[in-house]
């Protein structure tokens, strides 16, 4: 059961049985909290222009995401899990555009199963994948940030659970996420656009009954909440 870890959001992945794309800080933590809040689905797009075009067609859809880490003018929400956790998303469809996680997911569609996750849903996702796999399964894990240890720590944590080696513990992953270069700006009082409480949400492991799987048979790849 070969499991490869890739870092960054621009890969040409060979066909695989399972791809897992990680964005801890913050895209797929935001997505996780959106589904906890009742969201129906999350459409993934590469650009703000694509997001606005979809919004024109579906005015009730909620735009969420970022460019260069900050919220996009004209979007309904930014990329903050703290803010998402305070929203009622019952039966809402979202459109998400982010620099790393969404871009990486859209580059990882060449798989029978594509899952996305942050750390908050990493254990649940890994345990679900472990039940799916056979000895000859090809699995790719994509740590979507090009250099940050946050996504890499989560990738190694997930890989260890699937393999049964548990080489990285949850506590170790949390410390690496908090200590990563990506997290630094959230603790910098000179950068008020980045809220340190977001890192609390990004490092809280939740027990859940669903995974986030990307549905690929429509015009726009869409994350769905799949009960396990």
UniProtKB/Swiss-Prot annotation:
Q: Name one GO molecular function term.
A: magnesium ion binding
Top-level taxonomy:
Bacteria, Bacillati, Bacillota, Bacilli, Bacillales
Family, according to the entry, reads as follows: Belongs to the ComB family.
This protein's source sits in the domain of life called Bacteria
Q: Which reaction does it catalyse?
A: (2R)-O-phospho-3-sulfolactate + H2O = (2R)-3-sulfolactate + phosphate
**SUPFAM superfamilies with a match to the protein in the record:** ComB-like
User: By its UniProt entry, which HAMAP family does this protein fall under?
Assistant: ComB
Query: What cofactor does this chain's UniProt record say it requires?
Result: Mg(2+)
EC number per UniProt: 3.1.3.71
Disulfide bond listed as a keyword: no
Designated name of the protein? Probable 2-phosphosulfolactate phosphatase
Q: Name one Pfam family in it.
A: 2-ph_phosp
């Amino acid at each position: 059961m070969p499991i490869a870890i890739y870092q960054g959001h621009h890969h040409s992945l060979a066909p695989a049985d399972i791809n897992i794309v990680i964005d801890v800080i913050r895209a797929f933590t935001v997505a996780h909290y959106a589904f906890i809040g009742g969201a129906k689905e999350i459409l993934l797009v590469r650009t703000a222009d694509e997001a606005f075009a979809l919004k024109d067609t579906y005015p009730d859809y909620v735009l969420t995401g970022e460019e260069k880490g900050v919220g996009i003018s004209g979007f309904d929400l930014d990329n903050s899990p703290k803010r998402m956790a305070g929203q009622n998303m019952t039966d809402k469809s979202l459109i998400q555009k982010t620099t790393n996680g969404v871009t990486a997911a859209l580059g990882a569609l060449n798989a029978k199963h594509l899952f996305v996750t942050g750390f908050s849903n990493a254990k649940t996702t890994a345990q679900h994948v472990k039940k799916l796999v056979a000895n000859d399964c090809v699995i790719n894990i994509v740590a979507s940030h090009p250099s940050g240890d946050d996504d890499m720590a989560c990738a190694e944590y997930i890989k260890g659970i699937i393999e049964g080696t548990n080489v990285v513990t949850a506590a170790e992953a949390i410390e690496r996420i908090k200590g990563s270069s990506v997290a630094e700006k959230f603790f910098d009082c000179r950068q008020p656009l980045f809220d340190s409480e977001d890192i609390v949400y990004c490092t809280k492991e939740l027990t859940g009954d669903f995974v986030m799987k990307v549905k690929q048979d429509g015009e726009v790849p869409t994350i769905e909440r799949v009960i396990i």
